[in-house]
């Protein structure tokens, strides 16, 4: 009976979003160079993530992107081009929900990075504000990043790709992934027809719904972009108090349970 309800919900969502999603280009398109001024490229020698500049001194990304040595680039579009206003920073301090850095696919996959010095706003660099309200189910959301554009084999683009995906009720992801808990501080988003998705190396990047920064790319099934398999995003709104408290200097604050 539960399985029947889940399949029915998926069918309803598939039909309700079909027209909207069919307008999209499979896999997304190159982002407009002025569309992602807040998008950070979080990089080590063998690993790459995205991130979001939330003020001149702080970047928000996923906890699973943490590495010992990290470079954070702002103002990048084409990775093979050096831009005049491109800026590189390093983590001065990294903050996690738990001191042990424990996180799961559905809980506490969030990392707040204080940069070694503030970045300067420019034609290609500006911060993205934290959300003022939670997202609404049914929203069309924007994702972006330099992640692979093919899966399971990787094809990495030089420029970030942008695409629109749909925000679903959490129960949709629970129906697809039965191991998810009954309640969680994550968002469920994707395109039920498949073909559009975030993927490897997009982790840590933003999910922007109705112009507001609502999610952090966390986890998705492999291969990416499969039909009826949405991805999981850390819900930024539920972590606002934690983020704002740390920025204000209260570094002992803990994440919501």
Swiss-Prot record:
Name of protein: Snake venom serine protease CL5
Q: Name one GO cellular component term.
A: extracellular region
Q: Which Pfam families match?
A: Trypsin
* Cystine connections: 31-162, 49-65, 141-209, 173-188, 199-224
Write out the function statement from the record.
Snake venom serine protease that may act in the hemostasis system of the prey.
Identify the stretch annotated as signal peptide in this record. 1-18
- Which residues does the Swiss-Prot or TrEMBL record annotate as the active site? 64 (charge relay system), 109 (charge relay system), 203 (charge relay system)
Q: What Gene Ontology molecular-function terms does this entry list?
A: serine-type endopeptidase activity; toxin activity
InterPro entries in the record = Peptidase_S1_PA (IPR009003), Peptidase_S1_PA_chymotrypsin (IPR043504), Peptidase_S1A (IPR001314), Trypsin_dom (IPR001254), TRYPSIN_HIS (IPR018114)
């Amino acid at each position: 009976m539960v399985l029947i309800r889940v399949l029915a919900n998926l069918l309803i969502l598939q039909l309700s979003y079909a027209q909207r999603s069919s307008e999209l280009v499979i896999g997304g398109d190159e982002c407009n160079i002025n569309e992602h001024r807040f998008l950070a490229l979080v990089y080590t020698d063998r690993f790459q993530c995205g991130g979001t500049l939330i003020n001149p001194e702080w970047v928000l990304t996923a906890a699973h992107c943490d590495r010992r040595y990290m470079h954070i680039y702002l103002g990048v579009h084409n990775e093979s081009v050096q831009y005049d206003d491109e800026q590189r920073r390093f983590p001065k301090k990294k903050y996690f929900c738990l001191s042990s850095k424990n996180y799961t696919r559905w809980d506490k996959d969030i990392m707040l990075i204080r940069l070694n010095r503030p970045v300067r706003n420019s034609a290609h660099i500006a911060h993205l504000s934290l959300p003022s309200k939670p997202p609404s189910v049914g929203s069309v959301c924007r994702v972006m990043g330099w992640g692979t554009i093919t899966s399971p084999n990787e094809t990495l683009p030089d420029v970030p790709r942008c695409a629109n995906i749909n925000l679903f009720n959490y129960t949709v992801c629970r129906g697809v992934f039965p191991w998810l808990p009954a309640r969680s501080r994550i968002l469920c988003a994707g395109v039920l027809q498949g073909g559009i998705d975030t993927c490897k190396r997009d982790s840590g990047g933003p999910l922007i719904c109705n112009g507001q920064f609502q999610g952090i790319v966390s986890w998705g099934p492999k291969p990416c972009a499969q039909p009826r398999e949405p991805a999981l995003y850390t819900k930024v709104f539920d972590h606002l108090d934690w983020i704002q408290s740390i920025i204000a200097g209260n570094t002992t604050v803990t994440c919501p349970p």
